[in-house]
Amino acid sequence: MQIYKVGGAVRDRLLGKPVTDIDWVVVGATTEEMLAKGFRPVGADFPVFLHPKSGEEYALARTERKSGRGYGGFTFHASPEVTLEEDLIRRDLTINAMAEDDQQNLTDPYHGQRDLEERILRHVSPAFAEDPLRVLRVARFAARYAELGFKVAPETLELMRQLSESGELEALTAERSWKEISRALMEDQPQVFIQVLRDCGALKVLMPEVDALFGVPQPEAHHPEIDSGLHTLSVLEQSALHKQPLTVRWACLLHDLGKGLTPEEEWPRHIAHEHKGLKLIKAVNERFKAPKDCQELALLVGQYHTHGHRALELKASTLLELLQSFDVYRRPQRFEEFIVACEMDARGRKGLEQRSYPQADYLRGAANVARGVAVQPLLEKGFKGPELGEALKRERLKALKVYKESAAS
């Protein structure tokens, strides 16, 4: 029995990055031998075990053969005769196909260390094209290591392009796709993930609504970058630079989908793009079964981001309606995330990344004013039921009018 550290742990150590999760591969062992040593079996499809003390994953060396469509369409074979090299060749990228023994002696049959040094994301073998999930994984690695200068090898991008055209991407489950998308969006440069998907034709398959934004112009006076797709990438980039949560990043990606529906004769204006985009945002949300908080914020930002930009001009009554749409009294954090998404939208414009966004503090102040209206005096006056709600609304409107006047003076 020989045990090797494999995959990401080896890659990240060689890159000088912190190693968090460690995976191990066991060569020359049987399931019975692993159980006898106290390992706990957890793999449903192939022999994977948890170490009795560390809880880390140990997998028996295995080979795999394509047997059906999609991510799960594989037949696995694990036995003591499977070599380390045979196990490593089934992995996606050369930088993930290295192994180390307990003395840190490197086994690198597919030149992963060379590709690390040359900053290349390269597939290990033609079998790469058998697993459509790898398109998303490579794009995610491109986002993760963009700051180090990593690029996807042209021949790997070509395989990703073939996969995108094959129909295999449609076989991915919503859950697997969302897992990769959400992880990619939380990388330091998530816009690279979207760009790589576009470069290989996968964006057109997975998120045609986002792909449709590229080449659609906007008024240069407001958007010096002009292209709606490039603007979306910039907004997403800003959300990462400002360390925003997944909810905000997802909303930033989807906020302008309605612009892809504007007839060419109306370009570069996009009248009512907020409302038009809602059905597209809903479709993308449902396609990937995004978490409820991500779905809700994306729809609200899509519908109201122009309100956010025009906050200083809004009538007090419109401002109150905006606050109520977000249920700001019970869910203040959601409104805060909306404000931040609007600010990222404003900053995601060429040359305007550092421009101040006074609308943010104005909206926060308005929310505080509305929340500050006390209910008790109205109860003491005898208001109850629907009448209490209307009275509370009137008092909040009065308070917002005063707030608006004081902010203008």
Swiss-Prot record:
Its cofactor is Mg(2+); Ni(2+). Magnesium is required for nucleotidyltransferase activity. Its EC number is 2.7.7.72, 3.1.3.-, 3.1.4.-. GO terms for molecular function: ATP binding; CCA tRNA nucleotidyltransferase activity; cyclic-nucleotide phosphodiesterase activity; magnesium ion binding; phosphatase activity; tRNA binding. ATP binds at residues 8, 11, 91, 137, 140. The keyword Transcription does not apply. It comes from the Bacteria. Gene3D superfamilies: Beta Polymerase, domain 2 (3.30.460.10), cca-adding enzyme, domain 2 (1.10.3090.10). Monomer. Can also form homodimers and oligomers. This is Multifunctional CCA protein. The gene is cca.
